[in-house]
Every structure is written in structure tokens, then in C-alpha cells.
Amino acid sequence: MASTDGSPWFYPDRVGAAPGDTISIHASGPGGPCRLIARRIGAEETVCAEYPGIEVATHPIPEHADALGCGWPAAFSFTVGEDWPTGYIDLELIDETGSSTHHFLCCRPAAPTTGRALLVLSTNTYHSYNYWGGANSYANVDDLAEGLDPAAARNRAIGKLSRMRPFAQGLLAPPPGAPRLVNLTLRGPGELVIPGDVDWILEHAPSAYDGSAGFLQKWEHRFVAWAEANGYELDFACDHDFEIPGGRLLDDYGTVLLVGHSEYWSKHQRDQLDEFVDGGGNLAIFGGNTAYWKVRWEDDARTLVAHKWKGELDDERWAADDPDSEATHLWSHPAFDRPEAQLTGLSFLYGGYHRLAMCVSRGSGAYTIYRPDHWALEGSDLYYGDLLGAGVPLLGYENDGCPIRFEHGLPQPGDGLGIPRDLQIIGIAPAALLEPPDNPYGEIIPPENPEVLAAIAHGRADPTGIERLNRGHAVMASFGRGDGQVFNAGTTEWAHGLA
């Protein structure tokens, strides 16, 4: 993943901004003039500004640009216009041959808009999956593409990722028709699973990580397009905005929305969202795998530190049995005493994949409804035992859940890290964190370290603990925390069920 294809590659010096802020564009290309187009993407595309005549010189790609950044000089700067609408801004740099690449900017409103909810774009997750320069927090994706054994490629994942580099285009700006991460059709007896659109995959050869993050053609894009088409106007911010020193991002909002795949949270983000809900705010999560990994930003918020399950081994902030509040690992790690379910109500540790590869490969793709009288289902014409979303399918990819016990035929929250005792479970479906160990079709979903996950989720890293990871549930639920309320749809795929 380098700029040897002759395209003009670039990155902005910030990804969150408001009207009046100045953005510097750092770029390298084959030489010659380029133009930058800034488009606001929602139900419609709106050109906010176009800047022609940008001279872009050729600069080397340094070694370890994935971790250390490119260090290219600024080629151009612009000021976010006072008339730019809040939202996701696609930045496209185009050279005189028509070759182009994309980056992005999240434009906040100049001031909170009365009566609007705030949608927080999951940009920490975008950065964690970005493999421009070679590696991301999952693998060395370039080495994987060149034929390195998948396990060896995963061992070359990096725990520090620079924001000061371009984005892998298959991740950030995929070709039209990018498929969902779900088995759209049920496999027959003895058949291989068909994850997504095989013809599209064969034509475009995406990496294993391209479908897991980003805005365009994914969950947030679909949600925003639906909301705007139906008359719902939103304000926008992004994960990175929580790193603004002294910032109070959520003040003056009554509702915060998270959509799709908000997987990586810093302490600053968690602190503000905890305070927001405790103070009476409403948090609506239309996503899955939410707040799973604890991360931090360093170097003036230019470097994302995400050691993930290797935090105890590789993170210099980790002290034996007493990591400071900025150390990285699972939010559910007992050393932090702050599992994500205390805020979200659910955890991916107790959920998993549904209808993806061999994880619940013949699942219904739907929630079975147990509490049709819940306020979230008012006017839905759903009844006990009905399936919600089977025709979509609503469930796929990643789903959050909780341990479950039954009382008088109704699911109740069982014992789990941070799971609220007053959690109201609306619907459930089976989910699994790992593909079956006796799976004859080969591995499709790259596994995390199951021993670490089992030890944290179930207190044991032996085969019994690991087996429990494969008996999870996707859960749709709500609960009250402090003076606020939390609704959690429990699946990354919720936006695909909107009609």
C-alpha cells in the first residue's frame, strides 16, 4: 500500500473541525497541479468547496509510515466555510490525469443545534483498521496480500498507528456495490458459506479488513441517508473530537447516537459519555462491538495507541496489576474496573458473530421478540416470538450481548462484567465469537486471542472457558443509568434494517 500507482495521496492535519477552522493538506504525487473537492455526504451529495491549482510534489514514503506517519510537508490549506453543513465531508484530491484518492473530515456545527441529536462518527475505528503503509491493529495487510500466512501476518499487527498518513482506499472509499459482512444466503448441506457478493469480491479483491470500518457505503452512511430522507436532521462530531483539550463535546445535547461499529474508545470519550448519561442524557446505540477496546491518543492526538489484548505485554503505561487510566486493553479488563457494559448495557464478549462465515451460519438473521410491549417497539405490530428483520437480514457481522437466564419464559440478564441488573431484554438471537473448532471449511474470521477473551469474560482460559465464547447471544435491550437512558440495538447491522 504505497503511492507507487501514480495517484496523488494525501492526509489532512485534523479529521474533526468546525466552521472557521483551518485545515492543512499534506500530499505527495507524481507532480503537477491537483484540485481538491470537499463534498458533504448524506442522503444527497453537496459540494462544499473546490480548490484548483494545488501543486503537489513527489515525496518519499518513509519506513513504518503506518506507525510513524509520512512527514510530508503541507501542500495547501483551506478554511472550513461558515456555510458548510455539519456532517461527513469526503475530501477527494484529483490530479490532471483524473487519478484521485480520498480522505475525510467530520464537520461539527458552529454551535449545537437546538433539538437535534448528535451522531458521533466512529473515526477511532476507521484509524485502527487503516492499513496504508502496511499494517493496522489487526495484521500487516500488505504482507497478507502478498501471501504471508494469516497467523504470521496477524503477528505483525502494530499497537501504535499514525493518523498522519493517507487511508487505504478499499476501506475508506470502496467501489460501488461493496457487500455487507453477512452470509446473505443460507448454505445448503455440505456447502461452503458465501460471505457477501462473490462476483464483486472477485472483481475488486478487497482486503479482509475493508468492510469493517469507514463511512462511505457502510452503516453510518446508510443511517444518515435514511434519517435525512425521512426528515431527521442531525448534528455531527467524531471520536477524535473528544481529544480536544478541555472540550465539552456533549454539552447542550439531549441525545447521542452511535451507529455501526464504534469499537475503539479513549478514556476521554468514555468519561464524557458516562457523565452525559448520568446527567440525564439519552444514549442510543444502533451498532455492535461498541466500546470494546480501550485506546489512547499520543503526540498531540496524532498517534492512536491500540495494543488490544497485548496491552499487558506491550503497553509502557501498564504496571503490574495496576495500569493507569490511560493503559490499553479490553475495556472489560478487570484491572480497569470499568467494563463497557456499565454504559452500553451489553458487551461483544457475550455476543459475537451471527450469519457470518461459520458463526451461526444458518441463523435467522433476526431477533426473536420477547417483550413486544417495550416502548422501543410501540406501533411495530410485533408480538411475542415474532422475528424482527429476518428478510433483511437484520443480524450479521458483530453483535453485543449478555449472559442470559430465563424466568417464566422471559430472558433476564445473567451475571456478566458490568451487565446492569435492570436490563430490559427486548429480543435475542444466537451468536458466537469463534468459528466452530471442528469447522471443515477453513478459517474465514481472523480470531483474536481466545484464551485472553475467555479469561476475562468467564474467569478461565481453559477449553471450557473458550467453549463458552461460542454460546453467546445478540441482544436488543435498554436500561436506565443515573438520570439517563440507554437503548442498545446490539448489532452493527441495524442501519440495514431501516426502510
Question: What is each stretch, according to the model?
Answer:
Residues W9-G32, I37-E44, A49-F104:
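Ligand-binding face of N-terminal immunoglobulin V-set domains in extracellular IgSF glycoproteins
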Residues G133-S137, Q272-D274, W293, W297-W309:
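Short secondary-structure boundary/capping segments
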Residues A301-A499:
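Glycine-rich, aromatic-lined ligand/substrate-binding cores of catalytic
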Residues M1-S7:
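Proline/serine/threonine-rich low-complexity linkers at boundaries of modular beta-sandwich domains
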Residues G29-E45, A49-E55, S99-L249:
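Aromatic-Pro/Gly-enriched surface loop or interdomain linker
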Residues D90, L118, G254-V259, V486-N488:
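Structural motif
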Residues V56-C70, A75-T79, D83-P85, Y209-D299, ...:
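Helical hinge/lid and interdomain linker segments adjacent to catalytic or ligand-binding clefts
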Residues I94, V120-N124, D239-H240, L258-H261, ...:
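Active-site-proximal beta-strand/loop segments in catalytic clefts of secreted hydrolases
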